[in-house]
Regions:
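C-terminal reverse transcriptase regions that engage the nucleic-acid substrate
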Residues: 16, 20, 105-233, 372, ...
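RNase H-like nuclease module associated with reverse transcription
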Residues: 209, 244-245, 284-413
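Polymerase palm active-site segment centered on the conserved acidic dipeptide of motif C
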Residues: 46-55, 80-140, 225, 229-234, ...
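Catalytic palm subdomain of template-directed nucleic-acid polymerases
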Residues: 24-25, 62-101, 116-128, 208-215, ...
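Structured nucleic-acid-interacting core domains from mobile-element enzymes and related host factors
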Residues: 226-252, 321
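Electropositive, glycine- and tryptophan-enriched low-complexity nucleic-acid-binding patches
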Residues: 270-291
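Acidic carboxylate-rich catalytic motifs and surrounding loops in phosphoryl-/glycosyl-chemistry enzymes
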Residues: 48-51, 57-58, 104-116, 151-153, ...
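Conserved pre-motif C helix in the palm subdomain of viral-like polymerases
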Residues: 1-4, 8-93, 99, 134, ...
Length: 413
């Protein structure tokens, strides 16, 4: 950063005592410096409204004297601007340019994600997210290791990976690590987190063997990457005429990891007809029954929904927050337990933390509802489903088919 003497105008020079680029603290120090400048410049000098979001410190909300709100999202050295007034955004960009040496980029591309706008029908725009360039570059690196057949699903139906499976030797682990297993798994993770939610279960399974891969894990990782590559022009779609409030679907498998007895759960939060957050993960605790696993999954999904509600509220986007966010699951006992307090031999041992979902229902933040198993779109986050089910579930979750805007609760007695 260039600085000049306030009286003489002479350029000042600094002595670098320590190179922090690559240091674990470098990103934090840079973010701290950047935020102090933003607060000083926009809040005190320009008299703008300034608010660094508590729910996500990477987000800063700036409000001009005209009352126009703009969003600044900072990813270390990549910054995105979003808002409804282009002039205000260009003004903010110019303030950054005067202080830092910045290069303006094409907003269609960011962190390997391509964003396109199109009309799905007259006066109904949509935003489509894809990763074609990223997947093409990654696939070329490992093309000779891929099978020629095009997979119809990310994972073989019913596949389940766990540490110590197939009794692989240390030599086998080292072989697949040298082949680039971790790089492929990382690429799959980036794709699954951004444009391929249907690959989240398989990627979570593969990442369990990140340090000690075997042939089965290698085949699954290559299959997921191949699946993404052949669907690289497909992605997530958000529609202007889609459901304009938060909805959440959650589910859990009852098939446990043989090494620790813990099952896989998953959830997805949707808005404007597409997913805005999703996850597939192994439970932290052993589930004794299917309803126990489902109830724990509901608790995790509730925490994600509560965070999202508070973030949207902080962004002054309260119109997208329903009075009570619908939480859709397919287990009667889990739904009932979240709605009323009842102690039975089957649930009296549940850890207290998992009753957080009941508190959210009681306070009116969420509304738990029972949906049919075939309409539970989070099912694909808990197991490797057949192609016909993956197409049915995936098309809805990714915004290429309509979500139910209103799912009436089932009467449970």
């Amino acid at each position: 950063l260039r600085r000049y003497h306030p009286q003489t105008g002479e350029e000042l020079m600094g002595v670098l005592k320590k190179m922090i680029y690559g240091c674990p603290q470098s990103a934090f120090r840079w973010a701290e410096f950047r935020q102090k400048w933003m607060e000083r410049h926009f809040k005190h000098t320009l008299k703008w409204g300034y608010h660094q979001a508590r729910q996500d410190p990477c987000l800063t909300i700036l409000t001009s004297p005209k009352g126009v709100q703009s969003y600044v999202v900072s990813h270390v050295d990549d910054i995105e601007l979003a808002g409804a007034d282009l002039k205000e955004l260009k003004f903010i960009e110019e303030q950054y340019r005067q202080e830092f040496e910045i290069t303006s980029g094409n907003p269609r591309f960011m962190l390997g994600i391509q964003r396109e706008m199109e009309e799905v029908k007259p006066n109904v725009p949509s935003i489509n997210l894809t990763q074609p360039d990223f997947l093409e570059e990654t696939y070329k690196l490992y093309q000779d290791k891929m099978k020629k057949t095009v997979p119809t699903t990310p994972m073989p139906v019913g596949e389940f990976l766990y540490m110590g499976q197939d009794a692989a030797s240390d030599q086998e682990h080292k072989y697949y690590l040298a082949q680039g297993f971790q790089n492929i798994a990382g690429a799959c993770l980036w794709g699954a987190r951004n444009c391929f939610p249907e690959c989240m279960y398989g990627t979570a399974q593969v990442c369990r063997l990140m340090s000690k891969p075997n042939k089965r894990a290698w085949d699954c990782a290559c299959r997921i990457l191949s699946y993404m590559y052949h669907k690289r022009k497909e992605g997530i779609r958000y529609r202007a005429d889609g459901c304009n409030y938060l909805q959440c679907y959650y589910d859990s498998s009852h098939k446990a990891d043989p090494t620790d007895g813990k099952a896989q759960y998953g959830w997805v939060i949707t808005l404007m007809n597409g997913p805005i957050e999703w996850n597939s993960k192994k439970h932290n605790h052993v589930g004794i029954s299917s309803s126990h696993n489902e109830y724990m999954a509901l608790s995790h999904a509730t925490k994600a929904v509560m965070w999202m509600r508070q973030l949207l509220q902080e962004m002054k986007l309260g119109e997208y927050i329903p009075d009570a966010t619908p939480m859709m699951g397919d287990n009667d006992q889990a739904t009932l337990l979240s709605q009323q307090e009842m102690v039975t031999n089957g649930n009296k041992f549940y850890l207290l933390d998992y009753h957080y979902s009941r508190e959210a229902v009681k306070e009116g933040h969420t509304s738990t509802r029972r949906v049919d198993t075939k309409s539970n779109y989070s099912d694909m986050f808990t197991k490797a489903v057949p192609a016909i089910d993956l197409t049915r579930l995936g098309e809805v979750v990714k915004g290429n088919a309509g979500l139910h805007q209103e799912t009436p609760p089932k009467n449970i007695e």
